[in-house]
Swiss-Prot record:
Locations listed in the record: Cell inner membrane
Membrane-traversing stretches: 15-35, 38-58, 80-100
Role description: Channel that opens in response to stretch forces in the membrane lipid bilayer. May participate in the regulation of osmotic pressure changes within the cell.
Taxonomic source organism: Bartonella bacilliformis (strain ATCC 35685 / KC583 / Herrer 020/F12,63)
Main location: membrane
NCBIfam families in UniProt: mscL (TIGR00220), PRK00567.1-4 (NF001843), PRK13952.1 (NF010557)
Protein name: Large-conductance mechanosensitive channel
UniProt record similarity statement: Belongs to the MscL family.
GO MF: mechanosensitive monoatomic ion channel activity
Keyword Ubl conjugation: no
SUPFAM superfamilies on file: Gated mechanosensitive channel
Subunit: Homopentamer.
Length: 138
């Protein structure tokens, strides 16, 4: 049973998946930082200094100035957080699209290099002549 588990755990796909998950988690932190520290301030500047993370609609109670106070007072719709996550998703999707596109291009080039070139008609004819001459000598 231990041998079977070892075979399962050391399969190429399992190791590739583990590496992918670890890289994905590190990549997620990097993308979150890019979105929160670079893109959101620029978007806030373009929109007049709006802080998306503090945007909300209070559904119950008196109007509060901050999201935290509004959540303590009752139900709120935190649409600013949704906007931030939507922008985050779009940026991640955009980056992944270009990564996959680049990887596909590299894979395609590698397949083209590995693929043997088809022989020209002259080459085929010369090969046939060589084979016929070799058969006549035997």
């Amino acid at each position: 049973m231990l041998k079977e588990f070892k075979q399962f755990a050391l399969k190429g796909n399992m190791v590739d998946l583990a590496v992918g998950v670890i890289i994905g988690s590190a990549f997620g932190g990097l993308v979150n930082s890019v979105v929160n520290d670079i893109f959101m301030p620029i978007i806030g500047l373009i929109t007049g200094g709006i802080d998306f993370s503090n945007m909300f609609i209070q559904l119950a109670g008196d109007k509060k100035a901050t999201l935290l106070a509004a959540k303590e007072a009752g139900a709120t719709l935190s649409y600013g957080n949704f906007i931030t996550l939507l922008i985050n998703f779009l940026i991640i999707s955009w980056i992944l699209f270009f990564l996959v596109k680049g990887m596909n291009k590299m894979t395609q080039k590698q397949e083209e290099v590995e693929k043997p070139k088809e022989m020209s008609p002259e080459g085929k004819l010369l090969t046939e002549i060589r084979d016929l001459l070799a058969a006549q000598k035997e």
